[in-house]
Amino acid sequence: MEFKQGDWVRIERNGTVYEGKVMPSMEGYITIKMKSGYNAGFSIDKVRITLLENNGETANGSRNGGKGCKTNEEELPEPGKKLPKIAILSTGGTIASKIDYRTGAVTSQFTADDILAAIPELKEIADFKGRVISSILSENMDSDSWQNLSKAVVEEIEAGADGVIVTHGTDTMMYSAAALSFMIKTPVPIVFVGSQRSADRPSSDNAMNAICAARVAISDIAEVVVVMHGTTSDDFCEIHRGTKVRKLHTSRRDAFKSVNSLPVGTVDYGTGEIKTFIDYTRRGEKALKFKPGMEPKCALVKFTPGADPTVLDYYISNGYKGLVVEGTGLGHISTKWIPLLRKATDAKMPVIVTSQCLNGRICDRVYDTGRDMLKAGAIEGEDTLPETALVKLMWVLGQTDDFEKAAGMLREDLSGEITECTQR
């Protein structure tokens, strides 16, 4: 029999019956998505196939046939007229991914409109305008990507958006969130959201995360934040400041945590209630300011015992403009590294020191090594995360090439990256 993608079919094989929607399939095979959310594939010549719905239309001509089977051509809901206006900008990543049936791998193919169609609950929260900025996995983001994204966000705010949601791959989302935190001072919420598991998987977190992100986008939290699962259950999402968040697990749904700070707050998935735990910038409190410009020739170097200090020479001799060094404990490196650190700062290359511990604060005044590092010109990163310190360095050097001015800016708290008192 003939069938096509989107048809609802019954498949009988060895006395077992399967029902589902036809998905893209290889020649000679049929793949269906069952109600459970799982996919199943069969060799066509080894099964009996019965058509139940013709692309959402039953055999007697009625629509949907009670199965709730929706096709990719389903129209988006008409936006309400009195709801807040939210721009949703898609950059790719797992939240905008699905299975590539050619390879069996996950690929970034969904657009912002696809996300809106797949999560109809969003239409009850706001009027959404979808826009694709890129369709890449987040490991392919770079400083140019951050600037293009920030420009698009500013354009949406200037056009009257009450909030902006950025869908993003989780692996480097903290870098992008930090970058926009430094480039944009915003009067409205800018919310990064992603998912750890693609929409094809029954355990996908994309719908809950997107709904919670929408709640934050219409709130009065006018900062760049990351909204992701707070636990492994579907109970609430956490709201993390863009400069204080880190992905701390490869695959758990609650992989993102605030470091050296409490989260800004939480969003209850069931009620939509937002609770806040720390001070934050409120909607309309600041005027929109946009300062793009990133220096890409900066590097993050991790110190390890016995590491050859001449690794720093590579960056000095190849025209790099700044370095972040991840030291041990309170921010230490081998004494053998200190002459190279001095060589870098003598070359007017700012060097920020952070800690591999992540939690806690840098203090290079306790031990002799730390004091020698300060004498060599090292800048203490305080309780800034290494990744945030790198992005901050890139942004500062994109604003000025004056060494002393840059060093002064790097010692300041510019976007919540340094806390006066480390809370965690």
Swiss-Prot record:
Catalytic reaction equation(s): L-glutamyl-tRNA(Gln) + L-glutamine + ATP + H2O = L-glutaminyl-tRNA(Gln) + L-glutamate + ADP + phosphate + H(+)
Disulfide cross-links: none
Annotated stretches, region: Disordered: 56-78
Gene: gatD
Similarity section: Belongs to the asparaginase 1 family. GatD subfamily.
The species this protein was found in: Methanosarcina acetivorans (strain ATCC 35395 / DSM 2834 / JCM 12185 / C2A)
SMART domains (alphabetical): Asparaginase (SM00870)
A Pfam family per the record: Asparaginase_C
Record-linked PANTHER family: 60 KDA LYSOPHOSPHOLIPASE, L-ASPARAGINASE
One MF annotation (Gene Ontology) recorded for this entry: asparaginase activity
Protein name: Glutamyl-tRNA(Gln) amidotransferase subunit D
